[in-house]
Amino acid sequence: MKDTLSRLYEQGLTKLRTEVESYPSEAALWKTGGNIPNSAGNLALHLIGNLNHFFGATIGGTGYVRDRDNEFQSGEVSKERLIDEIEQAKSVVKDALGKLDPADLDKTYPIQFQNEDVSTEYVLTYLLGHFDYHLGQIDYHRRLLVGEETSAKA
């Protein structure tokens, strides 16, 4: 299971990078409109913050302190910086998973998750679904608000 999670998170982060790179401009990354309050840039920051918190700080002991509200308020971060942060998140996830023994997945996650004591496997699997949900939103955002007709093949 650990190898599967590692591979799926690596693929997801690579797809996130491809999506960010597929935006025609930095301004397009931060575009919102109508009933779409979150830009792709903010969703990317949210995913990065999520991984840094749940993998880096909680499993890896990195000391990362999450500011979730800021993930949705920050704006106009450069495309280059987002890509750098995506690559850093890849390392954070890889390092955190590397610290886990396969048996650790069955143990209770170090902090409560959604006000419950659940296994580490449950949390990491849940977070993968959360990641993919927002990745799909980013793809849809790019095509809807920016006018791209095709998927980024991410």
Spans of features found by a protein language model:
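Short, contiguous alpha-helical
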Residues: 6-10, 27-70, 111-154
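Acidic/histidine-rich alpha-helical segments that form the ligand environment
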Residues: 74-110, 119-131
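Charged, amphipathic alpha-helical oligomerization/scaffolding segments
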Residues: 11, 15, 46, 85-88, ...
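Residues on one face of amphipathic alpha-helical coiled coils
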Residues: 15, 92-95, 133, 140
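Surface-exposed helix-capping loop/turn segments at secondary-structure junctions
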Residues: 22-29, 97-106, 143-148
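N-terminal leader/capping segments at the start of a protein or of a new domain
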Residues: 2-15, 19, 23
